[in-house]
């Protein structure tokens, strides 16, 4: 499974990769990096944060909503998009944009007691079972 992890928080990336899961994953900190990579590579899963700047937030920076629009406008292919942002309004906007375009989206605000890798595996297994019908 190839995963693109879009988040400016290095601690989340460390938590995500701590168990050395055998997936190819790549972290980017800014929307511009993500659009560049998505224009060149394909991913099975894209994990999206919304706010892409450590406080103080600069509203003029591209955010997860901008990336969701890019994904739709450029018809980026992936099996699952995970929205892990704690920003409820931003996550709701991304969810609306992506689901209206037909993407399989998992709304999963990242709380430290959740294991995002386990959630991703369950979603992958569910899709594999559905594809095999």
What are these regions (language model features)?
Residues 1-133:
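Catalytic phosphate/metal-binding cores of nucleic-acid and nucleotide-processing enzymes, i.e., regions
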């Amino acid at each position: 499974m190839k995963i693109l992890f879009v988040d400016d928080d290095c601690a989340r990336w460390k938590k995500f990769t701590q168990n050395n899961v055998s997936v190819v994953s790549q972290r980017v900190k800014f929307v511009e990096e993500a659009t560049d990579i998505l224009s060149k590579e394909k991913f099975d899963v894209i994990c999206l944060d919304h706010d892409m700047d450590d406080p103080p937030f600069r509203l003029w920076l591209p955010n997860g909503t901008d990336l969701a629009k890019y994904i739709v406008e450029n018809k980026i292919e992936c099996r699952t998009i995970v929205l892990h942002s704690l920003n409820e309004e931003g996550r709701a906007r991304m969810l609306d944009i992506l689901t209206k375009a037909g993407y399989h989206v998992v709304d999963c605000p990242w709380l430290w007691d959740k294991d995002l890798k386990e959630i991703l595996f369950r979603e992958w297994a569910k899709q594999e079972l559905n594809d095999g019908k």
